[in-house]
Amino acid sequence: AKDSYISRYQDAFSTNALAGKKIVFYQHSAVGRDIVTTILENLGAEVIPVGRSDIFIPIDSENVTPDDQRYFKELAREHPGLYAIVSTDGDSDRPFVIDENGDFHRGDELGAIVTDWIKPDFAAYSISSNDAVDTYLEQQNIPYVHTKIGSPYIITAMQESGAARAIGWEVNGGYLLGTRVDTANGSLEPLPTRDAVLPIVVALVSAAEKATSLSDLFSILTPRFTSSGLIEEFPNVMSKQIVEQSSVD
C-alpha cells in the first residue's frame, strides 16, 4: 500500500515538477511524515524536515492555534528562500499548506486552489466553507453543491452528480477524487476518501507551473476573514443542548 501510494503521485507528476523548490516539512508525530517526504522528493523538491517527534503532538487544520501560527512564522524566518511549509495532522489525512511568509491557508480555500488546477465538471464541499469559494467557482463556471459536514455526504454528492470529473473536499483540507483525473504526465485514479497529499502537491505544483509564489497563488480568491477553533472543557450537557436546539430533520 505504501509503495502504491507513493507511485500514485510519481506517475501523475513530472519528476522535476518541484525542482529547485525548498520546502520545509513540519513532521511532528504525523504517521505519513516519511511517505510525504518521499513523494515531494520524488518530484524534485528539496525537503527540509523539522520538528520530528516520537511523542504525539495534537495539531488540527481546523484548530490552528496562535502558538501554531507563531511557529510557522518562525520557520519562515529561519529558512530564507523557502517555497512553502507543509504538514499534516496526526493521521495524515488533513493537510497544512503555509506560504513563504509563514501564513497558513485554510482547507476550504486550499480546496478551491486544487479545483482550479483540476478543472472538474462538478464540486461538492461542506456548507461550512466560506463564500469566497462559491464566488470563485461561479467565476469559473464550475457547478457545485454544499453538503452536510462529513466526507460521506461529499462522496454521495459526487456519486449522484453523474459528472465525468467529480471532486470534493472538506474544510479541513482533505480532498476527495470521485473520478479519474488526467494530468500532463499521467493520471490520478479515483480516491473517494480524505487525502492530504493531493492538495499539498497540487498547490505546490500549480504555483510552480505559474512561476508564482504560494501567497500570490491564493490571492486569486476574494479576501475573507474567518477563523475556527476548539473550546476546551466545554460541558457535555450544554453541548448536547446546543445540538438539540440546532438540529433540523
Describe each PLM feature range:
Residues 45, 49-51, 103-121, 186-202:
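Gly/Ser/Thr-rich active-site loops/lids in small-molecule metabolic enzymes
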Residues 23, 68-73, 86, 91, ...:
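Buried hydrophobic positions in well-ordered alpha/beta secondary-structure cores of metabolic enzymes
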Residues 34-39, 59-63, 95-101, 117, ...:
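Short acidic, glycine/serine/threonine-rich loops at helix termini
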Residues 82-84, 120-249:
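Phosphate-binding and adjacent anionic-ligand microenvironments
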Residues 36-100:
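N-terminal small/polar loop signature for handling phosphorylated ligands or for N-terminal nucleophile
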Residues 2-14, 68-71, 146-152:
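Active-site glycine-rich loop that binds ribose-phosphate moieties when present
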Residues 1-58:
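Gly/Ser-rich phosphate-binding catalytic loop and adjacent alpha/beta segment
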Residues 13-18, 76-80, 88-89, 96-97, ...:
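Solvent-exposed alpha-helices and their adjacent loops that cap or buttress functional pockets
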